Curated annotation (Swiss-Prot):
Compartments (UniProt record): Cytoplasm, Cytoskeleton
Taxonomic source organism: Spodoptera littoralis
EC number(s) on file: 3.6.4.-
Function statement: Actins are highly conserved proteins that are involved in various types of cell motility and are ubiquitously expressed in all eukaryotic cells.
Domain of life the protein comes from: Eukaryota
Signal peptide: none
A Gene Ontology term for the protein's cellular component: cytoskeleton
A Pfam family: Actin
Official protein name in the record: Actin
Modifications after synthesis and translation: Oxidation of Met-35 to form methionine sulfoxide promotes actin filament depolymerization. Methionine sulfoxide is produced stereospecifically, but it is not known whether the (S)-S-oxide or the (R)-S-oxide is produced.
Entry's family note: Belongs to the actin family.
Entry GO MF terms: ATP binding; hydrolase activity
Length: 164
């Protein structure tokens, strides 16, 4: 699961491309009762939130590559597992991505949610730029990662992002 400021990408190891790519947004109805008879939900995620944005208040739980709203991020992960990938997270090890300067407390919170909320059997958090470099068959190099909310230039040596 690649958590981006603008888009979330998710899929399975071994696949050539993500199975799901959708906006990293959570929307809630601006007014109660506006959507009467439409089976109104208390929140919408991704493409559904985008398509109903006219009557919703949209929130972006990832700002500049860093998760800032954990309740909404949990909704995005729930949507990823159950609606997009259609898997039981307790049956699959999970690989999550993070920004190069993601605070340690954030990584700990991601881990806690995966184990305690989604009962994931195993997980790993990897820096996005390192995974991009791996995809090119290299372990040492420099990656320019230009995303929707933040861009990073990341020097990587033998698989480790160098702080600079």
């Amino acid at each position: 699961v690649d958590n981006g400021s603008g888009m979330c990408k998710a899929g399975f190891a071994g696949d050539d491309a993500p199975r799901a790519v959708f906006p990293s947004i959570v929307g809630r109805p601006r007014h109660q009762g506006v959507m009467v008879g439409m089976g109104q939900k208390d929140s919408y995620v991704g493409d559904e939130a985008q398509s109903k944005r006219g009557i919703l208040t949209l929130k972006y739980p990832i700002e500049h590559g860093i998760i800032t709203n954990w309740d909404d991020m949990e909704k995005i992960w729930h949507h990823t597992f159950y609606n997009e990938l259609r898997v039981a997270p307790e049956e699959h090890p999970v690989l999550l991505t993070e920004a190069p300067l993601n605070p340690k407390a954030n990584r700990e919170k991601m881990t806690q949610i995966m184990f305690e909320t989604f009962n994931s059997p195993a997980m790993y958090v990897a820096i996005q730029a390192v995974l991009s470099l791996y995809a090119s068959g290299r372990t040492t190099g420099i990656v320019l990662d230009s995303g929707d909310g933040v861009s990073h230039t990341v020097p990587i040596y033998e698989g480790y992002a160098l702080p600079h």
